[in-house]
């Protein structure tokens, strides 16, 4: 009998990644990926507006001095928290990231690592799949509480308490 680890099963079972599936990462590995990146980018979705999630997200952004894209209606919440961000739809930013000649949010060149948090699962999955197949110049990392099989690296499925501990470890050095 085959036993599957429920921490690395896609949160929505219909999301089949194919032969290339995300690597399961710890907060320490995620932190190392961000530090190693030359031009990382944080994409913040509407699920990050929840106060506890927003607080952790803001601390991570400040800790790593990340340029930020606010998707959906997160722009206002980030602005009120003192975070500068560029408003883009998730589809729009995905299309920009696929273009190797795009100069990035700060005009310093294309991003080499994109970190996602708080994006709605089904749309994030499609964006991650698109980047996986059509943007080989970019690595993707999801620090959501659900495993995203189409990312290059992802946190496992977990409850809020464990997720908040994971996020806290990323900026509590």
From Swiss-Prot:
GO terms for biological process: methanogenesis, from acetate. Coiled coil: none annotated. It holds the Pfam family CO_dh. InterPro entries: CdhB, DHS-like_NAD/FAD-binding_dom. Pathway: One-carbon metabolism; methanogenesis from acetate. NCBIfam families: cdhB. Belongs to the CdhB family. Part of a complex that catalyzes the reversible cleavage of acetyl-CoA, allowing growth on acetate as sole source of carbon and energy. The alpha-epsilon subcomponent functions as a carbon monoxide dehydrogenase. The precise role of the epsilon subunit is unclear; it may have a stabilizing role within the alpha(2)epsilon(2) component and/or be involved in electron transfer to FAD during a potential FAD-mediated CO oxidation. Heterotetramer of two alpha and two epsilon subunits. The ACDS complex is made up of alpha, epsilon, beta, gamma and delta subunits with a probable stoichiometry of (alpha(2)epsilon(2))(4)-beta(8)-(gamma(1)delta(1))(8). This is Acetyl-CoA decarbonylase/synthase complex subunit epsilon.
């Amino acid at each position: 009998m085959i036993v599957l680890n429920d921490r690395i099963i896609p949160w929505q079972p219909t999301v089949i990644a194919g032969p290339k599936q995300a690597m399961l990462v710890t907060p320490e590995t995620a932190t190392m990926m961000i530090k190693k990146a030359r031009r990382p980018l944080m994409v913040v979705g509407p699920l990050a507006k929840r106060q506890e999630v927003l607080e952790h997200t803001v601390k991570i952004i400040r800790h790593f001095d990340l340029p930020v894209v606010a998707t959906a209606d997160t722009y206002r919440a980030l602005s009120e928290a003192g975070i500068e961000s560029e408003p883009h739809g998730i589809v729009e930013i995905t299309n920009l990231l696929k273009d190797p000649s795009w100069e990035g949010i700060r005009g310093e060149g294309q991003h080499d690592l994109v970190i996602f948090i708080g994006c709605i699962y089904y749309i994030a999955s499609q964006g991650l799949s698109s980047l996986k197949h059509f943007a080989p110049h970019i690595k993707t990392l999801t620090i959501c509480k659900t495993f995203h099989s189409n990312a290059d690296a992802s946190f496992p499925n977990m409850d809020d308490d464990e997720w908040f501990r994971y996020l806290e470890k990323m900026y509590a050095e």
